[in-house]
A protein has these predicted regions:
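Active-site-proximal or metal-binding-adjacent scaffold patches in catalytic folds
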Residues: 1-58, 67-97
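Walker B catalytic acidic pair
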Residues: 63
Length: 97
């Protein structure tokens, strides 16, 4: 997947989650798939672009939800699972297929 296509996918998910990221960056990250700043800047690992659809979707939705919910509480996890299931992405534990 190209960087442009990935950023388009992030924006499609952003509409679904009803948030607007201020910036989307792709770069090499050694320890995690992504991060979200308090200012609305999303940064994704370049390696994520090579992962299966479900893994990418989970990382994208996870970071977008952090724009509304800064923690991993019940609401956060419920919404994460609902958004993924609504798009037909199977949710199993920490990974999505």
């Amino acid at each position: 997947m190209s960087v442009v296509d990935f950023k388009e996918e992030v924006m499609e998910w952003a509409k679904e989650v009803r948030v607007t990221p201020k910036e989307i960056h792709i770069r090499k990250m050694n320890r995690k798939w992504a991060s979200c700043s308090k200012k609305g800047r999303l940064t994704f690992s370049l390696a994520l672009l090579k992962e299966p659809k479900g893994v990418k979707a989970r990382a994208i939705v996870h970071e977008l939800l952090h724009m509304k919910y800064p923690n991993h509480g019940k609401m956060f996890n419920t919404l994460l699972n609902v958004h993924l299931r609504n798009k037909g992405i199977k949710v199993t534990g920490k990974k999505s297929e």
